[in-house]
Amino acid sequence: MNRARKTSSCGCFRSAFCLLKPSTSSASEEHGDSDKKLLSVQLITPRDEEEQTSSRSIKIPPLDLNGLDCKKNAVAARRAGRRRTSEGGGVRGKGHFAEVVLDGLQRPVSLLRNQKEKSNSDDNCQEKEPTSPSSSRKKSYDNAPALESLEKLRYILHQLNSGQLPLEDLKRNIEYAALVLETAYMDETRRICDEDDDLAEVTPETVPDEVREWLAATFTRQNAGKKRDKPKFKSVANAIRTGIFFEKLFRKQQVVQCPIPPEIAELMKEVCTWSFSPFQLNEVSEGHALKYVGFELFNRYGFMDRFKVPLTALENYLSALEVGYSKHNNPYHNVVHAADVTQSSHFMLSQTGLANSLGDLELLAVLFGALIHDYEHTGHTNNFHIQSQSQFAMLYNDRSVLENHHVSSCFRLMKEDDKNILTHLTRDEYKELRNMVIEIVLATDMSTHFMQIKTMKSMLSLPEGIDKNKALCLIVHACDISHPAKPWNLHERWTEGVLEEFFRQGDLEASMGLPYSPLCDRHTVHVADSQIGFIDFIVEPTMVVCGELLVKMVEPLVSLPPTDSLFPPSVDGGDDKSPSNALSPLPDLRNSSTSPSSIRRIPLNYAGKLDIPTPWMKFLHENKAHWKERAAKEEEERKIKEAAEAEAAAKQVEENKENGVTTN
């Protein structure tokens, strides 16, 4: 009866996280060799919640939880589930089948085993000497070990099973889990629909798996994987994504620090600001702005530890990027521009709260894509390459000529062992990262600008979530053209550089007998007017859309309850216990006082409302006002010059007439 009551009271909590717990059905499992135990996995899906009393367990063969790879464990679990289903036992029908993903299960399982043994001993003690709920709860929380994210969730479940978790705390925890799942569901729904729609007409029963995989690989853009590796329940995928969310909050990154000199480290204190000056960094670092921005951000985001990036390989790769960016001695598309776009992308991720909704691989894709997005830029436009029938245009068939070269060359660089910064990524991680980076870099092709804006506006008008990859593409593209949205002293220097690059192309076009490309004739361009038009029709609409998509992606996270409500405070409020023996609460990322240097913070105002910073709007208006003043002066000067020329011409005519009369 006690077990039935416990199962009923925590069913919804288990369904939110698809929690796993060791079976306690036999005495041999309680006292036998732990290496020989069978793990019983209780699967509770939304459909099963109404039939919890009749739900069954899937028996998984003994697994070496200490030495066996987690992915192999997952495959073994899935195979065991299929065998169980085919034999007629376990879950009824296809709709009730769910795969068990055991990734990261090693420590939670061993923890629960220890906790179960401790729970049994505690239960025996309680039979002899009953204690009050408050005192037992205090003792339990004070003696809780310092656990990682998943283990903390397991510990909450253990407290619930043992009846030591207050009902109010349980309610808050369930509300929190539901909100997180709701946030994950928006993106997950779109992703799963994209995966399933392409081959929806070809059911698994009508063709063999091999033929279906060939169809997917040949006639769709989806990355076809083996069928058995694909989750069957959206709830399972949501639970996994929720686990990743908690893991991000709890993870204590042990970052391998890249070497950054003190004077450069001092400048890097401003790397989280929109007004950061890559020009100053380039001067102090003696031309190595890109390398040190790369070092700093790989440190801040923990990529060195998360993806096991070799320090030597990173230094070699960034140095090679700098060589490529300096190849054509461009006044604009150079090392400083690459550092600027990367730092601006970092601001978009870290200071708006967007990083909280992204995985580590997505964060790496954004920053890596920004680092390489103009590698070996020739200083000419795609249209110039097409019109001149350059080697690049021939190679890439006039399609995003430069962008294809940038991304292709940068991945080719990593074929050299001493520059392979992705050597420790799994095959699937590398494939996913490569696909995202290619999409991000190709989206910097200016010919795709209006299509990107139109697509994003359509997504913003719909109630569903935004396609995450398209959002990341637009963010990097916006940062690529964001110099008119920077402080005037930076914007003016960028304008001088880009126009000089245009003028050089115009000079080359004239020497080749080609017509001038727009803004490339140094004798006719009106600088102020060109920048006003660029701001009005390109940059400002892009930044407005960016602000709207950031709000839509981050706003769901604001509705999460205070993270310290996950764990009840000590009964007596004492602090005599060692911190290492107490459960620490989730970091409150919504706190407006959170350090701006944090890459995972949600900007809120004093009223607790989402307040995403948009400093670019202020600078856009200021810079446009500067250009309007300059345009007025240029127009006045032009009129004076034209009047002087007209007066000189009239005077010449008069002189000619006088000379003619005198001659006659």
Curated annotation (Swiss-Prot):
The reaction(s) this protein catalyses: a nucleoside 3',5'-cyclic phosphate + H2O = a nucleoside 5'-phosphate + H(+)
InterPro entries: HD/PDEase_dom (IPR003607), PDEase (IPR023088), PDEase_catalytic_dom (IPR002073), PDEase_catalytic_dom_sf (IPR036971), PDEase_CS (IPR023174), PDEase_N (IPR013706)
Pfam families, alphabetized: PDEase_I (PF00233), PDEase_I_N (PF08499)
TM regions (residue ranges): none
PDEase domain: residues covered: 256-634
Top-level EC class: hydrolase
Binding site for a divalent metal cation 1: H337, H373, D374, D480
Sample GO molecular function, one term: 3',5'-cyclic-GMP phosphodiesterase activity
E.C. code: 3.1.4.17
Biased composition (Basic and acidic residues): 28-38, 114-130, 630-644
Active site: H333 (proton donor)
Binding residues annotated for a divalent metal cation 2, in chain numbering: D374
Quaternary structure and partners: Interacts with cmd-1 in the presence of Ca(2+).
Protein's name according to its UniProt entry: Probable 3',5'-cyclic phosphodiesterase pde-1
Originating gene: pde-1
